């Protein structure tokens, strides 16, 4: 309880993205239908934590989000297929939701996903 409690009270969110995700999950999981949550959790695990995981929440800026967006837009499946615009928007919305939660409830100063657009 000690470390997590201290991390939850940190005003600059000086923890990594992957360390923040369990806090987000604990706060949000029960607010969605199970099928919706499973989709969100898959995106968080495979698209967000895999890219931003080791970065501190307070150090991620809009340029980092734009670099991630460019990587997602450039992704191709083994068959050469790109992610659809709707899926790319879904990915961005989930990233923005994580950062919005950090801003509203954990003292992060700004949402870099909202700034990146």
Where are these regions (language model features)?
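Short, intrinsically disordered, charge-balanced linker/junction segments flanking boundaries
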Residues: 113-117
């Amino acid at each position: 309880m000690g470390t997590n409690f201290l991390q939850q009270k940190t005003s600059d969110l000086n923890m990594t993205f992957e360390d923040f995700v369990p806090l987000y999950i604990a706060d949000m999981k029960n607010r969605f239908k199970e099928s919706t949550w499973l989709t969100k959790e898959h995106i968080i695990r495979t698209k967000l934590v895999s890219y931003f995981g080791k970065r501190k929440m307070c150090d991620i800026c809009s340029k980092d989000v734009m670099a991630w967006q460019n990587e997602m837009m450039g992704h191709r499946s083994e068959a050469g297929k790109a992610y659809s615009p709707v899926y790319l928007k879904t990915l961005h919305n989930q990233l923005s939701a994580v950062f919005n939660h950090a801003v509203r409830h954990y003292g992060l100063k700004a949402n870099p996903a909202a700034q990146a657009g």
